[in-house]
Design a protein with these regions (language model features):
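A structured binding-face within diverse protein domains that lines the active/interaction site
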Residues: 1-133
Length: 133
């Protein structure tokens, strides 16, 4: 299903960061990951155009994930395909960036579980919350 999209329908999703949930004895804890330098995260993805069973035209995309680098691994074993700005054109042209070293420095902090609520929206969802660790 995704082979054609991998070869011909790549996209970049610009983001300030992303969330991962760590399983702890207190339950799942959301962490916000972002570039240390504060720059944008260029996330590699694929897109598809298709028709639903009801006949609706749908445009969709999926983020690609790779094995987590050292900065992320403690929270989750996978992470989005994170590219440097100068790698974007090569990725869109079809280069396989999954084998590239993931040496981009990523910072993270715990955020409120409010991020899980679909009724919440806003920049405050990326604010750090106090923790004991």
């Amino acid at each position: 299903m995704f082979r054609h999209a991998w070869s011909h329908r790549r996209c970049i999703v610009p983001a300030d960061g992303w969330y991962e949930w760590m399983t702890t004895v207190q339950g799942k804890v959301p962490w916000y990951h972002h570039r240390i330098n504060g720059g944008p995260c260029w996330l590699g993805g694929i897109w598809e155009s298709w028709s639903s069973p009801e006949g609706d035209h749908v445009e969709s995309f999926a983020l690609l994930t790779v094995e987590a680098n050292e900065d992320v691994r403690e929270v989750h074993h996978r992470m989005p395909l994170l590219l440097e700005e100068h790698e974007v054109a090569a990725y869109l042209a079809g280069e396989d960036m999954r084998a590239q070293p993931l040496n981009l420095l990523v910072d993270r902090h715990v955020v409120s579980r409010t991020v899980n609520s679909s009724s919440e929206d806003g920049a405050h969802l990326t604010d750090a919350v106090p923790t004991l660790w």
